[in-house]
Amino acid sequence: MKANTKSKKVNKAWLHDHVNDTYVKLAQKEGYRARAAYKLKEIDETLGLIRPGQVVVDLGSAPGAWSQYLRRRMAPAGAAAGQLNGTLIALDILPMEPIEGVTFLQGDFREEDVLARLQEAVQARPVDVVVSDMAPNLSGVESVDAVRIAHLIELAVDFAQQHLKPDGALVVKLFHGSGYAQLVQLFKEHFRTVKPMKPKASRDKSSETFLVGMGLRK
């Protein structure tokens, strides 16, 4: 009974924080599906990754906030609402409500047939930017979760190696903890410039952080 009461208190505290969160309110005001849009926005504004005319792949895209931000950034200056200059391909294991101009594929990025569908959608075009907000279902066992997270990031790096332009960029979400240093090293082996970033929209209590790799090593 006590445990149940504690759980209710935790849920109530989370709900209070969520409802009063600056980025939640901003997302509602600006029409984003989730506050996560502002994490990518800060990374992009800091590093200047996204421009009209690019080919961009959004991995782990549901519910679609990152794709919404990317779509807005890729619209040409002065364009009518909804106009997109470039190619934006999104993929997630979960369904995602349609976004005008975005090609969405539903499937598990870890499965070969899904990866083949993604490669077909790219159509051998060099990709400018790959962004990944993918995260596995967490078990709560740090060693197990670290392996699952690392696997997804390694797959994203492999995809980037195959499809990015030489000066392209890869953005991935990861977590401080077991395996973090090894993933930073993996990025350093494959990219000329590596920048760890924790956007302001990432909650202070969260171990969530992001790695950005820019410029493929030959």
Curated annotation (Swiss-Prot):
This is Ribosomal RNA large subunit methyltransferase E. It catalyses: uridine(2552) in 23S rRNA + S-adenosyl-L-methionine = 2'-O-methyluridine(2552) in 23S rRNA + S-adenosyl-L-homocysteine + H(+). The gene is rlmE. SUPFAM superfamilies: S-adenosyl-L-methionine-dependent methyltransferases (SSF53335). Signal peptide: none annotated. S-adenosyl-L-methionine binds at residues 64, 66, 92, 108, 133. The active site is at residue 173. The lineage of its organism: Bacteria, Pseudomonadati, Pseudomonadota, Betaproteobacteria, Burkholderiales. Belongs to the class I-like SAM-binding methyltransferase superfamily. RNA methyltransferase RlmE family. It comes from Paracidovorax citrulli (strain AAC00-1) (Acidovorax citrulli). Its EC number is 2.1.1.166. The keyword Manganese does not apply. GO terms for cellular component: cytoplasm.
